[in-house]
Amino acid sequence: MKALSKLKAEEGIWMTDVPVPEVGHNDLLIKIRKTAICGTDVHIYNWDEWSQKTIPVPMVVGHEYVGEVVGIGQEVKGFRIGDRVSGEGHITCGHCRNCRGGRTHLCRNTLGVGVNRPGCFAEYLVLPAFNAFKIPDNISDDLASIFDPFGNAVHTALSFDLVGEDVLVSGAGPIGIMAAAVAKHVGARHVVITDVNEYRLELARKMGIIHTVNVAKENLTDVMANLGMTEGFDVGLEMSGAPPAFRAMLDTMNHGGRIAMLGIPPSDMSIDWTKVIFKGLFIKGIYGREMFETWYKMAALIQSGLDLSPIITHRFSIDEFQKGFDAMRSGQSGKVILSWD
């Protein structure tokens, strides 16, 4: 079967031919319809320091997808041939304390699809049936293919009660924009998103986010004053991993504010910890999606009217995968979809 693989320890992704994976007793065989390119895939393409430490070569990459069940392991129940599915990309052990306690997303033995085991940039994917999620009929293939990053956005945004709250989102990448859209959809009062990339801020506006701030040109505190905010933000969603953005968030949080962090800053990032202590801030780290509460919420948000379609900006056939990676690497894209049909 055709697959996109990391074949060499250098920059690039290559189309290759690999065997169709074998289905285990507890697995599903999924025929891939559409995949989306993640920022993680770009890191792997670029062969940066993280990738060099993490990715075994060769490796079929990719973890954002939708497909059709075409094979079922003999121990699997609850799925039928023809079911349309996406799936949780974190394969958990099932026997650690967190797994047994129902906190599966915190499994210390997690393996990543397309990172530690073969991924979805292929004609077929084998996945434990436990990890598969059936896609409702009224959700399109395009939207289903981005459930993985949408789940990151939902998990981050819904970490705290947002109704009537003022929310700051730092980082207008696709996940940050989707998190801002979720906050607005569920009843936040003012939702402000910051970045230095004007293309991404315009994309946020297309997604219905009114208050977009280019911090290279505008002062965030001036925007807050124009909105009549006198006490700071109640909730911060840090999606950028940029130290200046996190420091600005700490400066503008209200006392008792709550921050969810999905962006990954440099390990040597320094902050003024007195702002955390004396403001009584609560900071929560976010990794992946809650299994599977986040997945049900994703479907419900779309079914209740949340429109994510503007976040998908580019579509290519799988044979044009290089154009897709070029678009993602340019910084001038939202989500990029690759069709395998």
Curated annotation (Swiss-Prot):
Pathway assigned to this chain's UniProt record: Amino-acid degradation; L-threonine degradation via oxydo-reductase pathway; glycine from L-threonine: step 1/2
Residues the entry annotates as binding Zn(2+) 1: 38, 63-64
Residues that hold NAD(+) according to the record: 175, 195, 200, 262-264, 286-287
InterPro entries associated with the record: ADH-like_C (IPR013149), ADH-like_N (IPR013154), ADH_Zn_CS (IPR002328), GroES-like_sf (IPR011032), L-Threonine_3-DHase (IPR004627), NAD(P)-bd_dom_sf (IPR036291), PKS_ER (IPR020843), Zn_alcohol_dh (IPR050129)
Gene Ontology process terms (BP): L-threonine catabolic process to glycine
GO cellular component: cytoplasm
Signal peptide (from-to): none
Alphabetic keyword roster: Cytoplasm, Metal-binding, NAD, Oxidoreductase, Zinc
Cofactor mode of binding and number, as noted: Binds 2 Zn(2+) ions per subunit.
Subcellular location: Cytoplasm
Active-site feature positions: 40 (charge relay system), 43 (charge relay system)
Catalytic activity: L-threonine + NAD(+) = (2S)-2-amino-3-oxobutanoate + NADH + H(+)
Subunit relationships: Homotetramer.
Function (record text): Catalyzes the NAD(+)-dependent oxidation of L-threonine to 2-amino-3-ketobutyrate.
Family membership noted in the UniProt record: Belongs to the zinc-containing alcohol dehydrogenase family.
Protein name: L-threonine 3-dehydrogenase
Organism: Citrobacter koseri (strain ATCC BAA-895 / CDC 4225-83 / SGSC4696)
